[in-house]
Regions:
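Glycine-rich Rossmann-fold phosphate-binding loop(s) that bind the pyrophosphate
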Residues: 81-83
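Residues at the starts of beta-strands that form the adenosine-phosphate
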Residues: 76, 98-102, 203
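A Rossmann-like FAD-binding core segment of flavoenzymes
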Residues: 2-4, 8-26, 31-32, 95-191
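N-terminal Rossmann-like NAD(P) cofactor-binding module of classical short-chain dehydrogenase/reductase
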Residues: 38-39, 163
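Generic hydrophobic/aromatic pocket-lining and core-packing "Φ" positions
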Residues: 90-91
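FAD-site-proximal beta/loop scaffold in flavoenzymes
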Residues: 44, 49, 55-71, 166-207
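Phosphate-coordination loops involved in phosphoryl transfer and adenosine-cofactor binding
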Residues: 11, 73-75, 133, 201
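N-terminal Rossmann-fold NAD(P) dinucleotide-binding loop
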Residues: 86-87
């Protein structure tokens, strides 16, 4: 779509930037100069760091229900987390899967109340089962696919899909020493007075 407006698309991975003066310098496989820069690097899903989690990534472990949920139609799955992301993933999957186990390490959810209410309705319907004060210890399976999970309590649950929903990390590491940030997210002007997406450096914007 962008190409129809004359945008030139270059496939490269930028791993170094210099924003100290204009033109800004970007380095990847090649070097690029720009008087203005729009940062739209997105965020990456956070994982628990378990060896078994990485072993089955893409083979039963996922961090995106809308991407991979259809593979588990009428199957039993679990969602790890208790915030908005976990609640949204669990609700989405509850309309596809036979049952969703929501694994949360605390005794109450952190999600917005409207999402919690929907979760509890699905729980009454038997579509979602909440495991309070529980943490994922290990993803179980054979050499190719997930067959279940083990919790820190010792309980094992047979299922075929594990969805990790514990938050995201913004992809902003290369800007950390050059732009103002909060919790890894680039801060912008905001407001209605123009240049709402401008960062702490003039000519650098974040979306």
């Amino acid at each position: 779509h962008a190409e129809t407006f004359g945008v030139k698309i270059i496939n490269d991975h930028i791993d170094e930037v210099s924003l100290s003066s204009k033109p800004f310098l970007l380095k990847g496989n090649n070097e690029y100069l720009a008087n203005s820069l729009i940062i739209a690097t997105g965020a990456s899903a956070l994982y628990l760091g378990l060896d078994s989690e990485q072993k089955y990534l893409g083979r039963g472990v996922s961090a995106c229900a809308t991407c991979d949920g259809f593979f588990y139609r009428d199957k039993e799955v679990c969602v790890i987390g208790g915030g908005n992301t976990a609640a949204e993933e669990a609700l989405y999957l509850s309309n596809i899967c036979s049952k969703v186990h929501l694994i949360h390490r605390r005794d109450k959810l952190r999600a917005e109340q409207i999402l919690q209410d929907r979760i509890f309705e699905k729980e009454k319907e038997g579509k979602i089962e909440i495991h309070w004060n529980s943490q994922l210890k290990e993803v179980l399976g054979d050499e190719s696919l997930v067959s279940g999970i083990s919790l820190d309590s010792g309980k094992e649950i047979k299922l075929e899909g594990v969805f990790i929903a514990i938050g995201h990390k913004p992809n902003t590491d290369i800007f950390t020493t050059q732009l103002d940030m909060k919790n890894g997210y680039i801060t912008i002007n905001s407001g209605l007075n123009g240049n709402a997406t401008q960062t702490s450096i003039e000519g650098v914007f974040a979306s």
